[in-house]
Amino acid sequence: MASEFKKKLFWRAVVAEFLAMILFVFISIGSALGFNYPVRNNQTAGAAQDNVKVSLAFGLSIATLAQSVGHISGAHLNPAVTLGLLLSCQISILRAVMYIIAQCVGAIVATAILSGITSSLPDNSLGRNELAPGVNSGQGLGIEIIGTLQLVLCVLATTDRRRRDLGGSGPLAIGLSVALGHLLAIDYTGCGINPARSFGSSVITHNFKDHWIFWVGPFIGGALAVLIYDFILAPRSSDLTDRVKVWTSGQVEEYELDGDDINSRVEMKPK
């Protein structure tokens, strides 16, 4: 773990997460706040169109930034994704901690910038997540769990290096998963599925009402996604003890599929 801490590539990855998170939050939440501006009285027809625009903004920004910095940091841009990859034994504990810190600080910085730019907006929530009227904490938690589960499941499947059937754009697939989560959750919770993004808005607005939902829900969803993918859908035959070593060493071994039958159980072995 100490050796990873000393590597320039490690710190470049942390900086990439920080900068990409600033761009992600600024673009995504900025698109949502734009609906409050009476620019030439240009208002959309209804809430449904608003939801589609915001969902696409969040999804496309993730896809764009994943393509931009994915080769540097992996472009997690979400503590729930980072936790999922940690539990999947693909990153070290040190990297996970530093990524989550970078993501949270980046979200705060981006939201602070937005606060200055949109200071004239009345009742400016800065995209703060909150439960919709009639939605209780249990329901909101369930929505956040499901929305994050499908996202982290998509990340695990799309980045699985054992697969030989992958085609198209991985970043786009993940971005569409983010958009899908927003189409589901916006009307219930404002759609968190990203604790750092929720944290930034709560910090700047000094409002932490029901904020725990937007950490606990995504973390449970991310953990469930790992359980489902790594132990049920695509089990790994490599020794769990060896995989857990990644938590301290930060080294991920390359694996290949064992067997040509696409319907057979996925097996892994070091190259």
UniProtKB/Swiss-Prot annotation:
GO molecular function: ammonium channel activity; carbon dioxide transmembrane transporter activity; ephrin receptor binding; glycerol transmembrane transporter activity; hydrogen peroxide channel activity; identical protein binding; intracellularly cGMP-activated cation channel activity; nitric oxide transmembrane transporter activity
Glycan attachment points: N42
Extracellular topological domain residue ranges: 30-48, 112-135, 184-188, 202-208
Motif NPA 2 in this chain: 194-196
Domain of life per record: Eukaryota
Function: Forms a water channel that facilitates the transport of water across cell membranes, playing a crucial role in water homeostasis in various tissues. Could also be permeable to small solutes including hydrogen peroxide, glycerol and gases such as amonnia (NH3), nitric oxide (NO) and carbon dioxide (CO2). Recruited to the ankyrin-1 complex, a multiprotein complex of the erythrocyte membrane, it could be part of a CO2 metabolon, linking facilitated diffusion of CO2 across the membrane, anion exchange of Cl(-)/HCO3(-) and interconversion of dissolved CO2 and carbonic acid in the cytosol.
Gene3D superfamilies membership: Glycerol uptake facilitator protein
GO biological process, one term: cell volume homeostasis
Transferase in keyword set: no
Intramembrane ranges, chain numbering: 71-84, 189-201
Membrane topology label: Multi-pass membrane protein
Modified-residue entries (Phosphoserine), positions: S249, S264
Domain notes: Aquaporins contain two tandem repeats each containing three membrane-spanning domains and a pore-forming loop with the signature motif Asn-Pro-Ala (NPA).
Quaternary structure (record): Homotetramer; each monomer provides an independent water pore. Component of the ankyrin-1 complex in the erythrocyte, composed of ANK1, RHCE, RHAG, SLC4A1, EPB42, GYPA, GYPB and AQP1. Interacts with EPHB2; involved in endolymph production in the inner ear. Identified in a complex with STOM. Interacts (via the N-terminal) with ANK1 (via ANK 1-5 repeats). Interacts (via the C-terminal) with EPB42.
Residues annotated with Phosphotyrosine modification: Y255
Pfam families: MIP
Localization per record: Cell membrane
Organism annotation: Canis lupus familiaris
SUPFAM superfamilies, A to Z: Aquaporin-like
Protein family per UniProt: Belongs to the MIP/aquaporin (TC 1.A.8) family.
Cytoplasmic domain ranges by topology: 1-11, 68-70, 85-92, 156-165, 227-271
TM region(s), chain numbering: 12-29, 49-67, 93-111, 136-155, 166-183, 209-226
Encoding gene, per UniProt annotation: AQP1
GO cellular component: ankyrin-1 complex; apical part of cell; apical plasma membrane; axon; basal plasma membrane; basolateral plasma membrane; brush border; brush border membrane
Protein name: Aquaporin-1
Motif position, NPA 1: 78-80
Keywords tagged on the record: Cell membrane, Glycoprotein, Membrane, Phosphoprotein, Repeat, Transmembrane, Transmembrane helix, Transport
Main localization category: membrane
